[in-house]
């Protein structure tokens, strides 16, 4: 545990050192005045001329929301078409055929919504062109969408008596040109220097030193495993002495996969694969890349509203929640797994099942907490192999609404929604009209807040309930009992909250799960973005109220505690009954 606490402390210090200047830089990028941060001005203006965009024309919240939805719908259609036509397109050295319609739909929605749920195996499904032109491009655009939306909300707080919240196309372009692309280039070059591959070669067939005998599951005509009368998978012995090594442009996609809190990797093993994450140093940089923009945006928030203490308060609430849950996950994994107690496995160091020896329990536990605190979903260990209490942590982090740092942009606007709720609750307790950053919280704002908070629990709980009842949903569950329920609950929690990680024991690449999870991903993204933009518009139109003796300070320890309490209260009341049927019951049964 001491090793974990040391690595956690080093991680947080380095993150803070990097995030603060990046936050100040983004304040200049998205500010209303000309800034030295606009160092790529000629490139930016060229994009506007080509696209026919007037960067001086600002938008009301409805126009802004329409632009967000239109660009993402077009993106989803483009990714879908690319997958369906990839067998006729270049940069497909393995000759992969068209992706099935249901999987194409799921993948298109997944990458457009910044979820990156992957029901397929990337190295055996997607061509290089599909990975680069479809998935990697959406890694940039979905992250840029999240940043644009949170910047619009911040402008709503910063402005007063205004009818506009900015220009989506300007925010979208600046997010990509000034933030995402430069960071991705730096990180990509670093990854290449550490051994992450970057090429367009065909896959390599190599001969192994010794032959390998393994149990190969038998598949039916639809590609699903055949089960015996007891429900166990039917296998047959197979032997091989060759191995296929996948190639591809990995480093370039790996960088934006992390920086944009996307999470979907070119390989099925994701960041556990040595071609994506070869050593402890790349692992540490990947963890930094996940949190760097969400943390920096807290400083951008403080800078744009003219009070840096506001950003510190939000960052403090996020950090407290993160540290507590990270320590709990590490504690659970540093203990032996009761399921393996009777198998004669040496668990003196803790639960090593599903973890890479080059990372160990400490780095794997920290990575698992970071990737689910942010809406990233990349993994360097298999979450399905975590202990019951260990698996509880990433699931609960997602169910909190991905607000503990959260996704790029989405984490901060999600936490600001909770800040509005916290101020409203405080106002009720002291009998004053609630206000936040000088803006009065009224009926419309609370309606939008309620919608934004309640959408994902509705999708998660209803989706899980349907999946464990209907035949198509139950067919994908291979682990009976509480763990099987946990796998389904995790899948819908991940999809609706746009995380993308999985308890991979669930067979989710089926028409039922592809459609159900795809719908959850889309609604979980845009059913929150629209209310957030609506609040941005109403806040911008309001007058700024002067600070009085009765105004609740929203920059001190009391507000931090109130904000944390609001997040936990909603999460606990909503999900504890479902969690009691899954990981909690699984732990008690052992």
Swiss-Prot record:
Q: What main location does UniProt list?
A: membrane
Q: What does this protein do?
A: Part of the high-affinity ATP-driven potassium transport (or Kdp) system, which catalyzes the hydrolysis of ATP coupled with the electrogenic transport of potassium into the cytoplasm. This subunit binds the periplasmic potassium ions and delivers the ions to the membrane domain of KdpB through an intramembrane tunnel.
Tell me which species this is from: Ralstonia pickettii (strain 12J)
Q: Which UniProt keywords apply?
A: Cell inner membrane, Cell membrane, Ion transport, Membrane, Potassium, Potassium transport, Transmembrane, Transmembrane helix, Transport
Subunit relationships: The system is composed of three essential subunits: KdpA, KdpB and KdpC.
Q: Which InterPro entries does the entry mention? A: KdpA
User: Which ranges does the record mark as transmembrane?
Assistant: 3-23, 63-83, 134-154, 177-197, 284-304, 312-332, 359-379, 388-408, 411-431, 451-471, 515-535, 558-578
**This protein's name:** Potassium-transporting ATPase potassium-binding subunit
Question: Where in the cell does this protein reside?
Answer: Cell inner membrane
Q: Does the record bear Transmembrane in its keywords?
A: yes
Top-rank taxon, per record: Bacteria
How does the record say this protein sits in the membrane? Multi-pass membrane protein
A GO cellular component annotation in the UniProt record: plasma membrane
The record ties this protein, via NCBIfam families, to:
kdpA
